[in-house]
């Protein structure tokens, strides 16, 4: 419920008339529709302090499938905030919290517990067994993920998030519907004029596009470390562009022969 009790029980003593039960059920459904919130299976967690316009952190709630570089969304009244997970940390709020870090002083176990296990005279195998036993009997574990904000989707356009949203907002795995609204749009928020497929989003079958009109009419620089896939991306883009439009002419300066073998089928012998 958005206000009032989180949980509520209703007891009704019927006089045997089904009509009373029917009216009560209709009334309850009306209240539920107006004031309750259903999170759904795509819920990943809830935001925690601090939330910034550039990034936010959230506690994961039982979803072990989510990983680095996954895309997430936060649904607000003014739009949908899009983010990309950049880190995930696993924490233990009991014995395995660091007792020598002041920031965790309120959650770590008593130092005496460490002295008991790591004191002199204890066999190494005994120490391993003691720690393993504690770990498997301790339920005070959680994971916290950090996500960089990509922007906020408003009326089909991707804009900069200028103000932080509230702590405690639900965080969801990004939906295909949301991705479909942005993957064929350019940076201005308009639909791509010539969308060219260059790959798929990691761990999915969702296609990713580049607006060929933006590339051809302007300058584009492909940057990356050695082995990150600069040449592969460029070859993929050129081949997809040539397949989508036979009238396009591309000139490649290839002193090291990186492109010839992969693109020779597109060469006009004349």
Swiss-Prot record:
Checking InterPro entries in the record gives: HerA-like, HerA_barrel_dom, HerA_central, P-loop_NTPase
Going by the UniProt record, its keywords in alphabetical order are: Plasmid
Is the Transmembrane helix keyword given for this protein?
no
Annotated SUPFAM superfamilies: P-loop containing nucleoside triphosphate hydrolases (SSF52540)
Would you say which domain of life the source belongs to? Answer: Bacteria
User: Cross-referenced Gene3D superfamilies, in alphabetical order?
Assistant: P-loop containing nucleotide triphosphate hydrolases
**Is Phosphoprotein found in the keyword set?**
no
**PANTHER family, sorted:** HELICASE MJ1565-RELATED (PTHR42957:SF1)
Could you tell me what this protein is called? Uncharacterized protein aq_aa31
Q: Which organism is it from?
A: Aquifex aeolicus (strain VF5)
